[in-house]
């Protein structure tokens, strides 16, 4: 069920360019290149099909827009993402995020990122995140209990209700379901502003109070206020059940013992709110939507969860939910939270046999990798069995990157999978989902989100 893309890549190297020549220039007209760059979920596929798995764009004069290389092969992804963060810096999208939301693990440049990563890495190990999962199934059960038998529901809205509730109850010590608007609207406003400025070659100065800038700053202030309330409540109540907040308070850089300041903790909580709101909820919504179109797959998920009995699921049950995990991997393949990953080369580097100059903006097309017919059989089909152990054997680790890869991969991947697994198994054990929406429309203001309601009918399952 998995193909190996090395044959195509090596043939491309031999036929298209000598080793360490510059990547071939993309033949599409400038207008189509610009449109593809702004379409994170499908644009890299368009550029790959026209210019090959490593293709160079020129979107304007170098003094205005740096050269861009789009990479869509496993080898190219490895060559970019596995490098030391000293060689691969964050780019202007991350600079815009840092300016608006403050310095956090996602947007910090190398010098600030390294001590922060050292301090936070122990918090997010697979062992530790299991301590954060106590309320996930409980929240999912409560959401399902709200649905009348035969209810018509928007899977996107309900998935956000589950993930926000689980995030708040399990790790932040706060009922975020009562703060839905406090989180949802500011998050969407902030990420849209960041993505628009990051992708635009011509940007108004940050000091200019444009309407978009004012809205974005107000959104950032709202998120920081909420993060401050979460931190203050945890400090005021020693018994508050807020394991992530307590872990951030206790975090120390193992090399120098430095702890995080309250301002640094607030910035990390803001990015965690952003990631927890959009990314996991979209994965859960997509998985539910896909199961609503594949009755046999849905029945297998339900049978797996039912085999654990009628009790509430716990993090310890994830080991017995292997097929449910495979369903989520397939959802992440077809709808990755981050359709592209970007870096800036700080020195000349080799990318899949091509020489890329310092200062080049590098775009790794995750969606393009995940849907490449040279790498996957029937790439557009929803088939969780492709992630069974036998079918995963021999797969290039760099062709499936739902959480990125290398030293700057997503630090919260274990918690995201824990949350999505327990939520999906709990929901499907309790209801049958029948999807009414034929497609799952996606927009990518920054991460992938549903672009319209995802309607389905939820029928109760007899205990």
Residue ranges and their predicted role:
Residues 12-45, 49, 62-67, 74-79, ...:
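Cytochrome P450 catalytic-domain helical core, especially the substrate-recognition surface
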């Amino acid at each position: 069920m998995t193909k190996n893309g090395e044959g195509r890549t090596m043939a491309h190297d031999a036929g298209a360019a000598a080793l360490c020549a510059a990547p071939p220039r993309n033949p599409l007209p400038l207008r189509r290149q610009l449109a593809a760059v702004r379409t994170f979920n499908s644009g890299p596929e368009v550029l790959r099909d026209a210019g090959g798995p490593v293709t160079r764009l020129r979107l304007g004069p170098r003094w205005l827009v740096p050269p861009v290389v789009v990479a869509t092969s496993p080898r190219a992804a490895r060559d970019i993402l596995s490098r030391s963060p000293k060689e691969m810096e964050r780019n202007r999208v991350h600079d815009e995020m840092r300016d608006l939301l403050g310095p956090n693990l996602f947007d910090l440049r190398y010098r600030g990122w390294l001590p922060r990563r050292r301090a936070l890495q122990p918090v997010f190990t697979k062992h530790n995140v299991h301590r954060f999962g106590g309320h996930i199934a409980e929240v999912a059960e409560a959401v399902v209990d709200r649905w009348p038998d035969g209810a018509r529901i928007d899977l996107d809205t309900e998935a956000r209700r589950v993930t926000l509730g689980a995030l708040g109850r399990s790790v932040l010590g706060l009922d975020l379901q009562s703060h839905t608007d406090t989180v949802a609207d500011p998050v969407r406003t902030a990420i849209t502003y960041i993505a628009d400025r990051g992708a635009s070659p011509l940007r108004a100065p940050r000091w200019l109070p444009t309407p978009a800038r004012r809205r974005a700053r107000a959104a950032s202030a709202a998120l920081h206020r909420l993060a401050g309330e979460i931190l203050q409540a945890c400090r005021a109540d020693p018994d508050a059940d807020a394991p992530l907040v307590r872990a951030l308070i206790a975090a120390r850089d193992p090399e120098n013992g430095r702890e995080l300041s309250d301002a640094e903790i607030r910035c990390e909580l803001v990015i965690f709110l952003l990631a927890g709101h959009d990314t996991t909820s979209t994965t859960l919504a997509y998985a539910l939507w896909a199961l609503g179109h594949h009755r046999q797959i849905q029945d297998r998920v339900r049978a797996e969860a039912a085999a654990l009995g009628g009790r509430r699921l716990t993090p310890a049950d994830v080991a017995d939910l292997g097929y449910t995990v495979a369903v989520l991997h397939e959802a992440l393949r077809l709808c990755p939270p981050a359709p592209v990953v970007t870096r800036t080369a700080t020195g000349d580097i080799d990318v899949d046999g091509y020489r890329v100059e310092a200062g080049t903006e590098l775009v790794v097309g995750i969606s393009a990798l995940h849907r490449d017919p040279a790498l996957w059989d029937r790439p557009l089909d929803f088939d969780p069995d492709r992630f069974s152990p036998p079918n995963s054997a021999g797969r290039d680790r760099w062709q499936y990157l739902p959480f990125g890869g290398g030293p700057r991969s997503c630090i919260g991947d274990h918690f995201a999978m824990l949350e999505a697994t327990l939520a999906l198994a709990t929901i499907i054990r309790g209801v049958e989902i029948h999807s009414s929406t034929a497609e799952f429309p996606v927009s990518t203001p920054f991460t992938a989100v549903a672009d319209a309601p995802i309607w389905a009918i939820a029928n109760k399952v007899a205990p």
